[in-house]
């Protein structure tokens, strides 16, 4: 069984304008509300690909009710802990050919509410996959992912997509997969990586330190996969005009999990994940199965272990 965990979900208000003029009345070309949060995005893409999952985390208030209704209406199983305060509302604006995001503060989460979540996660079946994605609410502290990981079975496959201090903390957990981008790695190591060779080296160092597999996303330059047992690949993506990168990284995770859970090799799972992420960026919305299949033949993967 596949589970996704979103500690800091949101209702995302996506608004598209031809151009944005400050201190003036602006009219949207289109606007929509979405159930947001990285883990929720992973569950949504998995559903689009035909793979069931259960979305977990915290929801509260009218915004939380909207997310639950949205997931229920799409047939995405969910089992969130209900909290006292409202789930946040985030704004994603596309204007003047650029993306701007405004994220609201996370709600307060009580110690009792956190304990309820950890107790729920203790009961995950052996051989399950748990995808923990996104930021950690300030009320829980930067050790939240570690506390959760320590409360579940060692037989649960941990996939973690986060950044900053929570990313640094989870490296000691020996997760099955992490997926930082270049900027998150630069922040993690307080260094600048100017070449693919440097990224490969740092990826190998992370694997040697205990991370089982790592996907380093490089935007329009594709992605790198580093694993144990002399496994290293680079994926090249077609030169296309991306509509929006929002949700692309979550689609990479979902595509990888989908393929690997179906018995694909690490290489093929990586390729499918990159195809999913690229399809989402090209479409501007979370990809569907046919989008990924169409993109798959345009993704080229090379073995780079000796690079």
Curated annotation (Swiss-Prot):
PROSITE patterns: PFKB_KINASES_1 (PS00583), PFKB_KINASES_2 (PS00584). InterPro entries: 1-PFruKinase, Carboh/pur_kinase_PfkB_CS, PfkB_dom, Ribokinase-like, Tagatose/fructose_Pkinase. It catalyses: beta-D-fructose 1-phosphate + ATP = beta-D-fructose 1,6-bisphosphate + ADP + H(+). Its EC number is 2.7.1.56. The active site is at residue 250. Disulfide bonds: none annotated. Keywords: ATP-binding, Kinase, Nucleotide-binding, Transferase. The keyword Nucleotidyltransferase does not apply. ATP binds at residues 217-222, 249-250. PANTHER family: 1-PHOSPHOFRUCTOKINASE, 1-PHOSPHOFRUCTOKINASE-RELATED. Catalyzes the ATP-dependent phosphorylation of fructose-l-phosphate to fructose-l,6-bisphosphate. This is 1-phosphofructokinase. It comes from Borreliella burgdorferi (strain ATCC 35210 / DSM 4680 / CIP 102532 / B31).
């Amino acid at each position: 069984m596949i589970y996704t965990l979103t500690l800091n979900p949101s209702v995302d208000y996506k608004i598209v304008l031809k151009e944005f003029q400050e201190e003036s009345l602006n009219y949207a070309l289109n606007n929509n509300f979405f159930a947001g949060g990285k883990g929720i995005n992973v569950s949504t893409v998995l559903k689009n690909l035909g793979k069931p999952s259960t979305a977990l985390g915290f929801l509260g208030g009218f915004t939380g009710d909207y997310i639950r209704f949205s997931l229920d209406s799409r047939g995405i199983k969910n089992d969130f802990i209900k909290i006292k305060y409202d789930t946040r509302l985030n704004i994603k604006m596309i204007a003047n050919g650029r993306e701007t995001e405004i994220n609201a503060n996370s709600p307060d989460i009580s110690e009792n509410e956190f304990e309820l979540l950890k107790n729920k996660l203790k009961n995950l079946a052996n051989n399950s996959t748990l995808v923990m994605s996104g930021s950690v609410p300030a009320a829980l502290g930067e050790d939240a992912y570690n506390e959760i990981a320590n409360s579940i079975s060692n037989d649960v496959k941990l996939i973690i997509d986060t950044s900053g201090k929570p990313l640094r903390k989870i490296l000691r957990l020996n997760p099955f997969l992490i997926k930082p981008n270049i900027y998150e790695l630069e922040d993690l190591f307080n260094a600048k990586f100017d070449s693919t060779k440097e990224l490969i080296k740092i990826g190998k160092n992370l694997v040697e330190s205990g991370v089982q597999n790592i996907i380093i996303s490089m935007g329009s330059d594709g992605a790198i996969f580093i694993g144990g047992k002399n496994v290293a690949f680079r994926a090249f993506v077609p030169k296309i005009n991306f509509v929006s990168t929002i949700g692309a990284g979550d689609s990479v995770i979902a595509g990888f999990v989908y393929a690997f859970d179906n018995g694909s090799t690490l290489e093929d799972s990586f390729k499918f994940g990159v195809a999913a992420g690229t399809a989402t960026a090209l479409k501007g919305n979370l990809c569907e199965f046919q989008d990924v299949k169409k993109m798959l033949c345009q993704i080229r993967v090379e073995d780079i272990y000796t690079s």
